[in-house]
């Protein structure tokens, strides 16, 4: 249910950027106040990403006020901060549906709006895409302006610097806005810097700067002296030398919460030639005190009451798989001083907060740098240590070459604790962990484990930690099953599954064996009760329990594989490959994720829609058997 827009009289006049640009600039501060309040009141009722959006309200207003969007193209990196952008681009009334099934996408999405130039979700892609757009805009002579907005976390990734380096080399007309909300680059914000930004972005300074370069082009010594003098003057108050050396004209830092100052600076910069870099300072969670004090907790929020000073606590009960992993880390570190835990900027999400505090010398946050994180682990393994890389399934995709080249080829003992495997829910297509079994199963030396519950997860983590080669344990987002966890840890036999239920059906053609990989086990068992089917918990997607498969083939008419991974190339495909190699001809029904990018919705909604809940599994098997 959308909010009553009559309570936001200025925002009501700015449903699109064209309407926004018709407003007098004097009304912009009040518009920002209303936009921030609207965002807070909306997200608190629906859940979603909050703190990032609160921090870029003024920037969003200023960009759409100065630039002729959608003709001028604006790209948001990652997209957590794009809620104000959605509100101002005709989607205000739909904001209450964000991250819900059939609702607004959680991130900028090309299929949703002409104002969303790039579909995003993963970090550090915006500058590369903006550069591609800028190159083509120049070739078409369209006088189209291209802007990329990237955060101080995302810009640390190698891909961002690769794009900056390329842009600085070929010199297209484009603007990169660095939204610095962690004070990690500079604390120089204030009147002096705002004044300097106006001067450095102004036409007089620019014409003198460019004209001087032409005049002095034949006198390199004097030209170099002038360049160094300029750098010295700018360096006294700005940290932009690095970006200048990459070939950008650096402006800033500027107060990112002074909308009129941003408008003035952006107007100056809009017509500058070559690659421009605007550094703004913002506060994540701006305007809502609890979010300002704890931006990490308020990054993604459940439904809550904004009048309370804290978020609602979870009801307890079943632990999450992430918490099971975090407990394992702490317990294992007591015994193993050579355990090294690595995460690419996912400490909270991966359940590593306690470990990072109790074992700070064994904890390494590699930032948003998955490639580096994987090869960092390989170096530790070569040195005789026992690294564990905690990473989301969707982000392991970004370190795939390193997984092969720097870990598997050398058969190094690196364990990957793969969180968010399978469907993640509200974050949609970019975050589904749909492909990890498929892309790891083809790598030699890999061991891939698929725990069915939290106790299995704990034992498999121990198994991987003790294994002498590369291994992976994949587990889903959210709560585990609630069973009693065995604190004593024991390594499982690699490649051995377990038979949990045997059919009593004797009628030929109807004897079904379900081969379960992962946390759909409860659904498989429930369906099996109605079908009187055999159920095997396979445990390992690689290596497969070939002896168990042979036994099931001998005694059953149909095999059914089930996994929360893409059917293409998944564990079920591995079963079929084994059968064909050994001339074991048997009908196999593969259940799993279809050959499509799956949109957002709750995990339960998507499991039901894809017929992977107990009823859906039963029905798919009955349809296959034509019962």
Curated annotation (Swiss-Prot):
The keyword Metal-binding applies. It holds the Pfam family Transket_pyr. Thiamine diphosphate binds at residues 80, 121-123, 153-154, 181, 288, 370. Keywords: Isoprene biosynthesis, Magnesium, Metal-binding, Thiamine biosynthesis, Thiamine pyrophosphate, Transferase. Its EC number is 2.2.1.7. Binds 1 Mg(2+) ion per subunit. The keyword Transmembrane does not apply. Mg(2+) binds at residues 152, 181. InterPro entries: Dxylulose-5-P_synthase, THDP-binding, Transketo_C/PFOR_II, Transketolase-like_Pyr-bd, Transketolase_BS, Transketolase_C, Transketolase_CS. It is an enzyme of class 2 (transferase). GO terms for cellular component: cytosol. GO terms for molecular function: 1-deoxy-D-xylulose-5-phosphate synthase activity; magnesium ion binding; thiamine pyrophosphate binding. It catalyses: D-glyceraldehyde 3-phosphate + pyruvate + H(+) = 1-deoxy-D-xylulose 5-phosphate + CO2. Signal peptide: none annotated. It comes from the Bacteria. Pathway: Metabolic intermediate biosynthesis; 1-deoxy-D-xylulose 5-phosphate biosynthesis; 1-deoxy-D-xylulose 5-phosphate from D-glyceraldehyde 3-phosphate and pyruvate: step 1/1. Its cofactor is Mg(2+); thiamine diphosphate. GO terms for biological process: 1-deoxy-D-xylulose 5-phosphate biosynthetic process; isopentenyl diphosphate biosynthetic process, methylerythritol 4-phosphate pathway; terpenoid biosynthetic process; thiamine biosynthetic process. Disulfide bonds: none annotated. PANTHER family: 1-D-DEOXYXYLULOSE 5-PHOSPHATE SYNTHASE-RELATED (PTHR43322), 1-DEOXY-D-XYLULOSE-5-PHOSPHATE SYNTHASE, CHLOROPLASTIC (PTHR43322:SF5). Belongs to the transketolase family. DXPS subfamily. Catalyzes the acyloin condensation reaction between C atoms 2 and 3 of pyruvate and glyceraldehyde 3-phosphate to yield 1-deoxy-D-xylulose-5-phosphate (DXP). Homodimer. This is 1-deoxy-D-xylulose-5-phosphate synthase. It comes from Aliivibrio fischeri (strain ATCC 700601 / ES114). The gene is dxs.
């Amino acid at each position: 249910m959308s909010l009553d827009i009559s309570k936001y009289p200025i925002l009501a006049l700015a449903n699109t950027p064209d309407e926004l640009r018709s407003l007098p600039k004097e009304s912009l501060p009040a518009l920002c106040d209303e936009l921030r309040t609207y965002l807070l009141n909306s997200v608190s009722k629906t859940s979603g990403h909050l703190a990032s959006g609160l921090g870029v309200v003024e920037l969003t207003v200023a960009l759409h006020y100065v630039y002729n969007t959608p003709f001028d193209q604006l790209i948001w990196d990652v997209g957590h901060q794009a809620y104000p952008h959605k509100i101002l681009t005709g989607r205000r009334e739909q904001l209450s549906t964000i991250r819900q099934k059939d609702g607004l996408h959680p991130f900028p999405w090309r299929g949703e709006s002409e104002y969303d130039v790039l579909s995003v979700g993963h970090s550090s892609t915006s500058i590369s895409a903006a550069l591609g757009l800028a190159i083509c805009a120049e070739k078409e002579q369209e006088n189209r302006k291209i802007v990329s907005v990237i955060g101080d976390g995302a810009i640390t990734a190698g891909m961002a610097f690769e794009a900056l380096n390329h842009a600085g080399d070929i010199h297209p007309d484009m603007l990169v806005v660095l939204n610095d909300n962690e004070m990690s680059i500079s604390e120089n914000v204030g009147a002096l810097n705002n004044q300097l930004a106006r001067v450095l972005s102004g036409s007089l300074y620019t014409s003198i700067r460019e004209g001087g370069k032409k005049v002095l082009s034949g006198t390199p010594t004097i030209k170099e002296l002038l360049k160094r003098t300029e750098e010295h003057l700018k360096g006294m108050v700005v940290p932009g030398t690095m970006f200048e050396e990459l070939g950008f004209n650096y402006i800033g830092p500027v107060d990112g919460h002074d909308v009129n100052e941003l408008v003035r600076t952006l107007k100056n910069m809009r017509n500058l030639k070559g690659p421009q870099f605007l550094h703004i300072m913002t506060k994540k969670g701006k305007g809502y005190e609890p979010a300002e004090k704890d931006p990490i907790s308020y990054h993604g929020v459940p439904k809550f009451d904004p009048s309370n000073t804290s978020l609602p606590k979870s009801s307890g009960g079943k632990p999450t798989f992430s918490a099971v992993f975090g407990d394992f880390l702490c317990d294992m570190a007591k015994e193993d001083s050579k355990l090294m835990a690595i995460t690419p900027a996912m400490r909270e999400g991966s359940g590593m907060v306690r470990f990072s505090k109790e074992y700070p010398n064994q904890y390494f946050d590699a930032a948003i740098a998955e490639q580096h994180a994987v090869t960092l682990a390989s170096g530790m393994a070569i040195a005789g240590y026992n690294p564990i890389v905690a990473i989301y399934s969707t982000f392991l995709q970004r370190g795939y070459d390193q997984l092969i080249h720097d870990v598997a080829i050398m058969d190094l003992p690196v364990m990957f604790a793969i969180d968010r495997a399978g469907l993640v829910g509200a974050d949609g297509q970019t975050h589904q962990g749909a492909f990890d079994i498929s892309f790891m199963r083809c790598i030699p030396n890999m061991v891939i484990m698929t725990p069915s519950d939290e106790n299995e997860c704990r034992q498999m983590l121990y198994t991987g930690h003790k294994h002498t080669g590369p291994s992976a344990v994949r587990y889903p987002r959210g709560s585990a099953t609630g069973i009693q966890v065995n604190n004593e840890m024991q390594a499982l036999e690699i490649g051995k599954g377990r038979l949990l239920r045997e059919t009593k059906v004797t009628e030929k053609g109807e004897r079904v064996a379900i081969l379960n990989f992962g946390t759909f086990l409860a659904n498989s068992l429930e369906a099996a009760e109605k079908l009187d089917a055999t159920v095997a918990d396979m445990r390992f997607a690689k290596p497969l329990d070939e002896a168990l498969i042979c036994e099931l083939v001998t005694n059953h008419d149909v095999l059914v594989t089930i996994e929360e991974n893409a059917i293409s190339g998944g564990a079920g495909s591995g079963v079929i490959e084994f059968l064909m190699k050994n001339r074991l001809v048997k009908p196999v029904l593969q259940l799993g994720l279809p050959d499509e990018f799956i949109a957002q919705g709750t995990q339960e909604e998507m499991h039901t829609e894809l017929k992977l809940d107990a009823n859906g599994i039963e029905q798919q098997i009955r349809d296959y058997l034509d019962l």
